[in-house]
Amino acid sequence: MSGPNPNKQPVELNRTSLFWGLLLIFILAVLFSSYFFN
């Protein structure tokens, strides 16, 4: 995440962190579901 002014857009950073958080939860859910089904 390279930018000229990273502190100028806190909303963008919040959206990025929220996106990665949801992605991590989705991956964990897929792993747990595959673990339970096998």
Curated annotation (Swiss-Prot):
InterPro entries: PSII_PsbL, PSII_PsbL_sf. It is a single-pass membrane protein. GO terms for biological process: photosynthesis. Its main location: plastid. One of its GO terms (cellular component) is chloroplast thylakoid membrane. Coiled coil: none annotated. It is found in: Plastid, Chloroplast thylakoid membrane. Keywords: Chloroplast, Membrane, Photosynthesis, Photosystem II, Plastid, Reaction center, Thylakoid, Transmembrane, Transmembrane helix. The chain crosses the membrane at residues 17-37. It holds the Pfam family PsbL. PSII is composed of 1 copy each of membrane proteins PsbA, PsbB, PsbC, PsbD, PsbE, PsbF, PsbH, PsbI, PsbJ, PsbK, PsbL, PsbM, PsbT, PsbX, PsbY, PsbZ, Psb30/Ycf12, at least 3 peripheral proteins of the oxygen-evolving complex and a large number of cofactors. It forms dimeric complexes. Belongs to the PsbL family. One of the components of the core complex of photosystem II (PSII). PSII is a light-driven water:plastoquinone oxidoreductase that uses light energy to abstract electrons from H(2)O, generating O(2) and a proton gradient subsequently used for ATP formation. It consists of a core antenna complex that captures photons, and an electron transfer chain that converts photonic excitation into a charge separation. This subunit is found at the monomer-monomer interface and is required for correct PSII assembly and/or dimerization. This is Photosystem II reaction center protein L.
